[in-house]
Design a protein with these regions (language model features):
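Non-catalytic DNA-recognition/assembly elements of restriction-modification systems
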Residues: 356, 711-722, 839-961
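Signature of N6-adenine DNA methyltransferases within the class I
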Residues: 21, 59-62, 84-86, 98-108, ...
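Conserved residues in the N-terminal Rossmann fold of short-chain dehydrogenase/reductase
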Residues: 108, 398, 403, 442, ...
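A short, conserved, highly charged catalytic patch centered on acidic carboxylates
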Residues: 1-105, 119-123, 147-148, 152-157, ...
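Preference for the N-terminal adenyl/adenosyl cofactor-binding alpha/beta module
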Residues: 1-18, 132, 137-370, 400-410, ...
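Polybasic, glycine- and aromatic-enriched phosphate-binding surface used to engage nucleic acids
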Residues: 79, 96, 506, 593-858, ...
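Flexible phosphate/Mg2+-sensing switch loops adjacent to catalytic phosphate-binding sites
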Residues: 44-49, 209-213, 329-347, 369-399, ...
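Glycine- and acidic
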Residues: 12-20, 76-78, 151-158, 173-180, ...
Length: 961
């Protein structure tokens, strides 16, 4: 097979040599067709690829990509002899917009060379380059092109090199601290060694200088003296007059101001020698820092397992907030004066990351701004009056970048990352700037709390034009346990405008909104921010504290509503990029709203398997506005809570036992069989959806005190044996810093024989009903089911105290479904039914007639009949059944839902094409006004005017005997 492949590829090389002169416009398509044939296809069309595919521009109009083969590759052709490095930005822009099912790889080709990119893992340099003449023997990097693709083999895959290099320095650091070297000295020594390793491979030190020095460190004393002397010389503005270190230049007085001297063991010297064997010019500073930082204290985790934020995810902030507005201005500049003004602006353009970690956002922001600066110079060169030797001496400096973080070591890493960024930009862009001395960034990076100053007031932030970053992902319920009550009191005192139940990151959003300058006609580049937050920033208190305020003073121009985040395990995030203005002249008319979709199935692998890809796909639509829910739909975020929905209570979370021993399999019933009044059937959420029933029973003492509970000796002894020790242990382990048992642990211990949350109020309501409604609390699509009144629901279920078919119809309709999706909170990627935001604000029909009520009832009964008939012949339960709704084509289930939706619209008085959210929001507002006036309104359930409401309750239910 390999020989056959080689023959086809050799024939392609010979054909190109004989027939192609390298004309991009005239020969690209025939070249690409032959290229596909060389890899075993019948041609690019037969493989499913498209030439000249339309790609939307950032503003108006379209570009045309030379070839797109989803989900495999985008190919951009350039004329023979063209410098492919100049076309990276164009290729990345095309790739970004080719959603959904975006190609995994990108190829830039000038008929003689193939530059291969994998932007998911490595952005600014190719993962490999293959010359045309090498193709028969070096097709490994292009192995994804074959009809039966194999894993490509890349020669410049910098992520793996970076992880391996980081691993060596992590082991060095752990070895030093493990044997008692002061932690601060060990950190400083490691960072200074890191700079030396980079320096000898990127031309700041003589090649192999540090490696040869390590060869001579044959004793701990020599290691102390030789390496220490190198660091001392790197801090000296005066070169050594002679000797071994006379070639060492001055680096700066920041990183090396305190040269670290350590007597290294032979094993530690070996770690450094192994590290020196890597080509550090291929180590990526923007991911090295994060990997290194996250590995330092994780004894069970080496660098290869650490998470980092992928550069392509960082560009989802840096691109819209920094690159796009600058790129538009640069390309639209029409005079030399325009370009000179842009140059002056960009050289004074300042960026802040107030939760910078090891500096990866700032590194990529700096790199992209240097590219923009280079593009300004390139365009200035188009004017004959410009003498390149007379260019101004000013340039974008790393001193324009500011960072804050509570972790001192992360700040030191960030400084090193930014120091390296300058030299790497010089090499990448071939610009004439002095690499040394490195900028001293001590004044730019601050160690400490970014939110609170020592006196409890808001921390002062540096004055900048733009703010970027990803603040800590910490949910509201974890703030007190993780940060302490005292800290949270001071934080809420300093930020009274942020609600108490807002996630931690919301404080950064609100602080950024208040700190940013206004975006104006003269300062169009300022007043911009892009932050990553928990996906909950779109919802409830978090939304009120952050995005509501942002939308009140500015405009969200690009957002991602929900995606997995590459930087943390099992975290789903939302991203908002905004401008602090509502002036139509300063914001784009078309805003970009990205949203997660189900991965499109294909015979080809759509995404990489690395952690940065996390198996998801995004799509994008251009919209006229993005609201504080990060949606372009009617904004229901400000809907009012309706008192008629709250009192009396209609909806509850199911029972939370709090310990597995309270839930009994059928086989364990015998141990307490003589005390049946404490036991009831118990239902968990998965049983409803999967159709698989594992009979469980709940042991529940209810509200009985300990003396009453002892009247049931078997059950009491069982709980005393199985539950009490666990609650005693939890109380002990959960003490606060003052040694006090936390309130919830104290409550559980004081009533250890009772369920954690027995929901007595819910059980009282359900005891009056023959059946009740439930749906899963965490669900993409609420599927409502009646449950027999004898069964007690578990905490994975949202419970609704309705037994009638009319209420079922309203809740199962598209009206409630759309309201749910607009108002729910989220757990990871799945929506969560939050009664306070969804049910308590949902307006029920006010003028339903007996005829429209009956129509809803009959349609709801019919829907359940269709479901029941289908389930009799389908494995997998309701979950499997409802997956068929997403498939194309007609089905009885779709028809039944359409019938129900039409009936519910008529009950509301909505037209068939009326926007449901708009109609419901208007009704919500009218009901709030009516309630405030003291008028009688129709709350949840059967309309009060309906005669003989008992006729609206059928008998089918889950668990019915």
């Amino acid at each position: 097979m390999t020989d056959q492949r080689r023959v086809l590829l050799q024939q392609f090389v010979l054909w190109v040599d004989a027939h192609i002169i390298g004309d991009e416009k005239g020969e690209a398509q025939v070249f690409l067709d032959k290229f596909f044939r060389a890899f075993g296809h019948e041609g690019f069309k037969e493989a499913g690829a498209t030439c000249e595919m339309r790609v939307k521009k950032a503003d108006k109009g379209v570009n045309f990509a030379d070839l797109v083969w989803k989900p495999v590759v985008l190919v951009e052709m350039k004329k023979r002899g063209e410098d492919l490095s100049k076309h990276y930005s164009q290729a990345f822009m095309y790739w970004t917009r080719l959603v959904p099912n975006r190609p995994h790889y990108v190829i830039l080709c000038n008929f003689d060379e193939f530059w291969i990119y994998d932007f998911n893992s490595q952005m600014d340099s190719p993962v490999d380059k293959v010359k045309l003449v090498e193709l028969p023997d070096r097709f490994g990097p292009l192995a994804f092109m074959f009809p039966q693709p194999t894993e490509p083999v890349f020669g410049n895959h910098q992520e793996s090199v970076t992880r391996q290099a980081a691993d060596r320095l992590v082991m060095l650091f752990r070895s030093m601290t493990g044997r008692g070297v002061d932690r601060e000295i060990a950190q400083r020594f490691t960072l200074q060694s890191l700079m030396a390793l980079f320096a000898e491979d990127i031309g700041l030190l003589e090649k192999y200088f540090f490696a040869r020095l390590l060869d001579d460190c044959v004793t701990p004393e020599l290691a102390h003296d030789l390496i220490g002397q190198l660091f001392l010389q790197m801090d000296s503005a005066s070169r050594a007059s002679g000797g071994r270190f006379k070639s060492v230049p001055y680096f700066n007085g920041g990183l090396f101001s305190m040269p670290a001297r350590v007597e290294l063991t032979s094993e530690e010297v070996e770690h450094l020698k192994e590290a020196a064997k890597f080509d550090w010019s291929k180590v990526r500073p923007e991911i090295f820092g994060a990997i290194f930082e996250h590995s330092m204290d994780a004894d069970d985790r080496r660098a290869h397992g650490a998470h980092y934020t992928s550069p392509v995810d960082i560009m989802k902030v840096v691109g819209p907030t920094i690159v796009d507005p600058w790129h538009e201005r640069i390309e639209k500049a029409r005079t030399l004066r325009d370009l000179e003004n842009l140059l002056l602006k960009i050289e004074n353009f300042k960026v802040l990351d107030p939760a910078c970690g090891s500096g990866n956002f700032l590194y990529i922001a700096y790199r992209e701004i240097k590219k923009l600066e280079a593009r300004i110079y390139e365009r200035m060169g188009d004017y004959k009056s410009i003498d390149s030797s007379q260019r101004p001496m000013g340039f974008v400096s790393t001193r324009n970048f500011f960072g804050m973080d509570i972790n001192p070591f992360a700040i030191e890493l960030a400084k090193v990352t930014m120091m390296l960024a300058h030299k790497l930009a010089i090499d990448e862009l071939h610009i004439q700037e002095q690499a040394l001395p490195l900028d001293n960034l001590d004044a730019n990076f601050t160690v400490g709390d970014a939110l609170l100053a020592e006196d409890g007031t808001q921390r002062q932030w540096p004055l900048v034009e733009v703010i970027v970053g990803n603040p800590p992902f910490l949910g509201a319920k974890l703030l007190k346990p993780k940060l302490g009550s005292d800290y949270m009191k001071r934080l809420r005192s300093a930020y009274p405008e942020v609600p108490g139940m807002a996630d931690f990151c919301v404080y950064w959003f609100r602080r950024a909104e208040g700190h940013l300058p206004l975006c104006t006609t003269d300062s169009w580049e300022a007043g911009r921010a892009g932050l990553v937050g928990t996906q909950n920033i779109r919802n409830n208190a978090s939304r009120v504290g952050g995005l509501d305020a942002i939308c009140a003073s500015g405009t969200i121009v690009e957002a991602i509503d929900n995606q997995p985040w590459s930087g943390e395990a099992n975290v789903h995030v939302s991203i908002a990029n905004w401008v602090k203005t509502q002036d139509d002249i300063l914001v784009p008319k078309a805003r970009k709203l990205w949203f997660k979709i189900a991965s499109i199935s294909s015979g080809r692998k759509a995404r990489g398997s690395g952690h940065a890809s996390k198996e998801f796909d995004l799509d994008m639509r251009e919209v006229s506005h993005i609201n504080a829910s990060l949606s372009d739909k009617v904004d229901v975020g400000a809907a009012f809570t309706l008192e008629c929905n709250v009192t009396p209570s209609f909806t509850f979370q199911g029972i939370t036992p709090g310990h597995a021993a309270f839930v009994l399999p059928k086989g364990e019933l015998s141990s307490i069989s003589a005390e049946p009044e404490l036991v009831s059937s118990y239902l968990v959420g998965d049983e409803i959806l999967s159709g698989v029933s594992n009979r469980r029973f709940l042991l529940n003492f209810g509200q009985r005190d300990v003396l009453e509970a002892r009247r049931f000796p078997k059950a009491f002894a069982y709980v005393q044996k199985n539950v009490l020790p666990a609650r005693q242990k939890a109380a002990e382990e959960g003490k606060d810093d003052q040694g006090k048992v936390r309130p919830h642990h104290r409550r559980f211990l004081e009533r250890w024989w009772q369920l954690s949350w027995g929901r007595a109020d819910m059980l009282e309501q359900l005891s009056k009903l023959p059946r009740y409604l439930v749906c899963s609390r965490v669900t993409k699509r609420p599927i409502f089911t009646f449950v027999h009144g004898s069964i007690h629901p578990g905490d994975a279920l949202q419970v609704f105290a309705f037994s009638d078919d009319y209420s079922f119809g309203i809740l199962q309709s598209s009206a409630h479904y759309e309201w749910f999706h607009a108002k729910c909170s989220n757990m990871k990627s799945d929506p969560r039914y939050t009664s306070e935001s969804v049910f308590d604000t949902f307006p029920w029909p006010q003028d339903a007639t007996p005829e429209t009520v009956n129509a809803v009832v009959l349609a709801g009964i019919h829907l359940r009949q269709v479901r029941s008939l289908a389930l009799a012949h389908l494995d997998g339960g309701l979950r499997a059944l409802y997956k068929t709704v997403d498939l194309p084509g007609k089905s009885p289930l779709k028809d039944a839902h359409a019938e129900l939706d039409a009936a519910v619209r008529r009950a509301y008085g909505f037209g068939p094409r009326q926007d449901l959210l708009e109609g419901l929001l208007n009704l919500n507002s009218k009901l709030k006004d009516a309630i405030d006036r003291g008028d009688v309104v129709q709350g949840p359930g059967i309309p009060a005017s309906y005669k003989e409401p008992e006729r609206l309750t059928s008998t089918d239910s889950f668990g019915q005997v």
